[in-house]
């Protein structure tokens, strides 16, 4: 007879299996897409290099710092309850690095590396060019044209209402119309950080004479506060729609089946082609350079002319389809891989904590809230007049006050209406681009 194993004992095979399962479980934990053990090793290497002043003060060292922090903060921001629903990754990626600089956690070696990447090598401008050009060229042309026609009145009405409310409430609290408009209202409705705040900061710096980082720290707080309240308003509109079925299109914006079919058509996703992505890099760089060239003759900041020229080329259908696909694939790669790392760089260099604290106050927050309420309220009532469902119209118009594509996702998720994404993109991209262009022209006019 074989020996009977004692109760509670584990055979060597079972022990090996348990250890293997534990090892696999640990490797299944991820920070972003990186297994936790590997992420830990990478982080330790980078931290030690920075501590012993061996971190290269160039693009390599800069990317190492912003990537290791951006991957971590973006992942954590997507996991924390409540925070994840109000733009957590963006908030953490911008402000945690700012705290690290304020409390001298990051040494001069790390700061030099990030400075060389963001300022000397101008990764910031490269990111802006890829996002703006790729997002515009990648839009469905029919949706772009028809969406602009359909959303023109609600967008214009919402923008006018937001501007009027912001200036009026600002006046009550002692803000000048100039400060309320250019530093509170405009950042909220500019289309996010990458495609709104950053081009704006460049334009403001060229017109007013200070460096772009000065304006980033002044513009970002309004954009983030506006985004948070826009998400809250979207959730409240969902509750209103649940209680009032007559106001609710259940995800349909217009009271016309044919019109909804136009906006819901999807183009087949092209297979990823790295050569086309390379062409996308060339297109993004050239559009940026073209904007700078035109600036010499038109006297409008190059970043704004880049937006206008990309939209004009898309509207005229000039580029071969595969070139547009290359620019769009590059846009998706850059936006999905470098958004949180870039915001880490912005937080380190462009958002001094003391400057941000000096901007935010109770009146400032109330002005931001009034802008969003005016935007969503105008969308509601204009939607009623234009054969749209008021709840959906209000939610789509509300996207104009969110943090770009990230804000669109958060707002539509909070309202349970992800099917409105094509309209949200029109509201955010075209509305944001229009805001940036108009604000720049007006600022030039008032300071000339």
UniProtKB/Swiss-Prot annotation:
<dbReference type="InterPro" id="IPR018025">
    <property type="entry name" value="2-OHcarbox_trans_Prot/Firm"/>
</dbReference>
<feature type="transmembrane region" description="Helical">
    <location>
        <begin position="182"/>
        <end position="202"/>
    </location>
</feature>
<keyword id="KW-0813">Transport</keyword>
<dbReference type="GO" id="GO:0008514">
    <property type="term" value="F:organic anion transmembrane transporter activity"/>
</dbReference>
<dbReference type="InterPro" id="IPR004679">
    <property type="entry name" value="2-OHcarboxylate_transport"/>
</dbReference>
<keyword id="KW-0472">Membrane</keyword>
<keyword id="KW-0915">Sodium</keyword>
<protein>
    <recommendedName>
        <fullName>Na(+)-malate symporter</fullName>
    </recommendedName>
</protein>
<keyword id="KW-0769">Symport</keyword>
<keyword id="KW-0739">Sodium transport</keyword>
<dbReference type="GO" id="GO:0015293">
    <property type="term" value="F:symporter activity"/>
</dbReference>
<keyword id="KW-1003">Cell membrane</keyword>
<feature type="transmembrane region" description="Helical">
    <location>
        <begin position="276"/>
        <end position="293"/>
    </location>
</feature>
<feature type="transmembrane region" description="Helical">
    <location>
        <begin position="123"/>
        <end position="143"/>
    </location>
</feature>
<feature type="transmembrane region" description="Helical">
    <location>
        <begin position="31"/>
        <end position="51"/>
    </location>
</feature>
<dbReference type="GO" id="GO:0006814">
    <property type="term" value="P:sodium ion transport"/>
</dbReference>
<keyword id="KW-0812">Transmembrane</keyword>
<comment type="similarity">
    <text>Belongs to the 2-hydroxycarboxylate transporter (2-HCT) (TC 2.A.24) family.</text>
</comment>
<feature type="transmembrane region" description="Helical">
    <location>
        <begin position="297"/>
        <end position="319"/>
    </location>
</feature>
<feature type="transmembrane region" description="Helical">
    <location>
        <begin position="359"/>
        <end position="379"/>
    </location>
</feature>
<feature type="transmembrane region" description="Helical">
    <location>
        <begin position="153"/>
        <end position="173"/>
    </location>
</feature>
<keyword id="KW-0406">Ion transport</keyword>
<feature type="transmembrane region" description="Helical">
    <location>
        <begin position="333"/>
        <end position="353"/>
    </location>
</feature>
<dbReference type="GO" id="GO:0005886">
    <property type="term" value="C:plasma membrane"/>
</dbReference>
<comment type="function">
    <text>Acts as a Na(+)-malate symporter, as it catalyzes malate-dependent uptake of Na(+) and Na(+)-dependent uptake of malate.</text>
</comment>
<feature type="transmembrane region" description="Helical">
    <location>
        <begin position="86"/>
        <end position="106"/>
    </location>
</feature>
<keyword id="KW-1133">Transmembrane helix</keyword>
<feature type="transmembrane region" description="Helical">
    <location>
        <begin position="60"/>
        <end position="80"/>
    </location>
</feature>
<dbReference type="Pfam" id="PF03390">
    <property type="entry name" value="2HCT"/>
</dbReference>
<feature type="transmembrane region" description="Helical">
    <location>
        <begin position="214"/>
        <end position="234"/>
    </location>
</feature>
């Amino acid at each position: 007879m074989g020996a009977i194993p004692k109760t509670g004992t584990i055979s060597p095979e079972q022990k090996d299996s348990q250890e293997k399962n534990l090892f696999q479980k640990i490797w299944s934990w991820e920070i972003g897409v990186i297994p936790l053990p590997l992420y830990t090793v990478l982080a330790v290497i980078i931290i030690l290099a920075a501590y012993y002043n061996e971190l290269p003060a160039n693009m390599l060292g800069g990317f190492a710092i912003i990537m290791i922090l951006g991957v971590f903060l973006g992942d954590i921001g997507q996991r924390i309850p409540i925070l994840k629903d109000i733009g957590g990754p963006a908030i953490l990626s911008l402000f945690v690095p700012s705290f690290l600089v304020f409390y001298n956690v990051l040494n001069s070696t790390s700061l030099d590396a990030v400075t060389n990447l963001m300022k000397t090598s101008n990764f910031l401008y490269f990111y802006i060019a890829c996002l703006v050009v790729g997002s515009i060229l990648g839009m469905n042309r029919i949706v772009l044209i028809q969406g602009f026609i359909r959303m023109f009145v609600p967008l214009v009405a919402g923008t006018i209402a937001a501007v009027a409310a912001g200036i009026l409430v600002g006046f009550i609290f002692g803000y000048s119309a100039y400060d309320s408009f250019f530093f509170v209202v405009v950042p909220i409705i500019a289309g996010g950080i990458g495609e709104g705040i950053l081009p704006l900061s460049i334009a403001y710096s060229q017109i007013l004479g200070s460096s772009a980082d000065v304006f980033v720290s002044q513009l970002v707080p309004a954009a983030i506060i506006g985004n948070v309240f826009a998400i809250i308003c979207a959730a409240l509109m969902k509750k209103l729609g649940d209680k009032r079925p007559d106001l609710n299109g259940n995800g349909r914006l217009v009271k016309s089946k044919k019109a909804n079919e136009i906006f819901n058509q999807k183009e087949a996703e092209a297979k990823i082609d790295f050569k086309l992505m390379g062409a996308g890099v060339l297109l993004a760089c050239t559009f940026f350079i073209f904007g700078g060239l035109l600036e010499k003759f038109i006297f409008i900041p190059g970043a704004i002319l880049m937006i206008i020229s990309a939209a004009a080329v898309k509207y005229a259908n000039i580029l071969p389809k595969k070139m547009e696909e290359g620019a769009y694939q590059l846009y998706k790669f850059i936006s999905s891989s470098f958004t949180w790392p870039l915001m880490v760089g912005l937080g380190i260099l462009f958002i001094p904590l003391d400057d941000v604290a000096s901007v935010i106050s109770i009146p400032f927050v109330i002005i931001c809230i009034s802008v969003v309420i005016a935007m969503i309220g105008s969308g509601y009532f204009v939607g009623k007049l234009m054969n749209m469902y008021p709840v959906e119209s209000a939610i789509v118009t509300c996207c104009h006050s969110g943090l770009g594509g990230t804000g669109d996702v958060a707002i539509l998720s909070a309202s349970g209406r992800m099917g409105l994404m094509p309209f949200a993109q029109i509201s955010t991209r075209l509305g944001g681009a229009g805001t940036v262009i108009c604000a720049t022209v007006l600022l030039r006019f008032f300071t000339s």
